[in-house]
Amino acid sequence: MTDITPEQTQPAKPARPRGRLTRWWDSDVAWSFRHSPVAIVATFVVAVMSLAALLAPWIAPYHPFDPATLNLLDGFTPPMQENQFTGNVFWLGTDDQGRDIFSAILYGSRISLFVGISAVLFAMTLGVTLGLIAGYVGGWIDTLIMRVADVQLSFPSILIALLVFGIARGFIPPAYRADMAIWVLIVSIGLSDWVQYARTVRGATLVERSKDYVQAARLIGVPSGLIMLRHVLPNVLGPVLVIATIGLALAIITEATLSFLGVGVPPTQPSLGTLIRIGQGFLFSGEWWIILFPSIALLALALAVNLLGDWMRDALNPKLR
């Protein structure tokens, strides 16, 4: 007969619970990300450009919008060439005022990203709130919100943003318009993009409110606001994150368009769109680098964010898993 040792009779140690990061790494979304070269490259581009924009005051060779650091003799210096008057060399060249294009892109990206992210957060907050109310309450409130959304959808987003921007500036005293320009721009872009969030959340809320867990919460007397925030909202956020990612690229392009038209951020705080507008005046005079490099930066940022949003849409779609 085989003897049983005390070690063999001891119960097995329970497995350690996996951390949240480990569970995410083993999820279908993480697996899709690891096997998607497009998503990896897009994430890398967005991360590098965002980090460079955030650290612009420390990594930019010059402060391109400080008059004390500008030298007109450096104007129109081609990329990687020595200026014949000052002997300075600029990686991406300079504009007519002697501003370093590389430094201007870093500072301009900060404004573009700040406006884009803030506008998306504003539009998402407004759209999700109205969509939850419309889908959960229903009745004439649902009809009113959706009819307003339908009317707004009949106009281009850029036109809505221009209209809101012009009306808002009319109520701001001239002395404060420059300081409030960025915030007015954020609200204008946000008000032009809230509809898609509201329609998506409303549709998902209509499905969720008829489920048993919502009906049970109603029966035990949970307030409607608490049901929407604690039970319905977490289950409708998946599509919202996808819309927000794609909407960030749209918000950045909208901001650049408005700034290119001269109705965006003030000249003292130029974005990528403002830099493109400055370079447009020298496009046919031989100084091609003034418009080329800001345009490439805007294209790379918007394209990377858009590709990341496309991947997220496919990764979160259960039908494609």
Predicted feature descriptions by range:
Residues 3-4, 44, 52-93, 261-269:
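Hydrophobic alpha-helical transmembrane segments of membrane transport/permease proteins
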Residues 97-321:
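Alpha-helical transmembrane segments of integral membrane proteins
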Residues 10-30, 87-102, 134-138, 225-229, ...:
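Short, membrane-interfacial amphipathic segments enriched in basic
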Residues 3, 15-68, 145-148, 236:
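N-terminal signal-anchor/first transmembrane alpha helix
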